[in-house]
Amino acid sequence: MKGGSVVETWDALQKDVEMYLAKRPGKTAVSCWLLTEKQGFSIGGKNELPSASLIKLLVLVELCEEVRRGRANLKEAISILGPAITGGDGIIKELKIGHTFTLEELATLMIIVSDNEAANQLIDRLGMKAINERAKKLGLAQTHLGRLMMADASGEKERDNWTSADDTVHLLRVICETAKTGSPLGRWMISLLARQQQEGGLRRNLPDFVQVAHKCGNLAGVEHDAGIFFGKRPYLLAVLTTEQPASYVGRETIGMVSLLCARAFGLLG
């Protein structure tokens, strides 16, 4: 694929990815976008899927928009009063009730360790309606926040959290475009994603020198990872897997799709 046109690269890469996915269990949606060439490909990219923690990207973008408009301040403090502390990923649940965090700290925890309580505190502060309105304004047709993290949706679609591979890549584009304008908020969002501590997906088969800023998400049978890849040909990649027999199987799929893209775009040297 080296030395070919962008179209030839896309066609060959998409074929390689499709051939690989045909052999894998479960279902996988992929969306990839080259930032410089402004071209990409999508495999099932508009399929509406359980978002898992990828929905936290939308919460982060809405927080930064509220800060930009002067309706929120990253230094604003919120006390975790309990007694119901959200389970699942995170460290806030391990701390004493009454601990105080700034919005900046909550966002940091929400992204780098996927803290569910931090996400819920931010959702309460911003408002679920406002977050969903942000999704609509951004043109995210398959993305919806219907519940707090770890809350029971009771099988009702409108009470669950959804997204798609294409919507996730679009959100990452918004973050990159915000940073490109010189906005400190844009650079901050990328710095949070670059400090991601949950690995095993996009970075699984890549050497340490490859720079990736990303966000993972997982539920029973669901493994997602989406990120920004830096290099001479920077690109965005979202790989969403569902109906997985085990978590590691989904992560293996994500890792191989990521490796195929990294090879195609010359990230491996």
Which residue stretches match the model-derived regions?
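Short, conserved catalytic-motif segment at the N-terminal edge
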Residues: P25-E48
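Short, glycine/proline-biased beta-turn/loop segments that scaffold the active-site neighborhood
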Residues: R69-L95
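A short glycine/serine-rich beta->alpha loop
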Residues: S42-P50, I92, K96, K157-E158
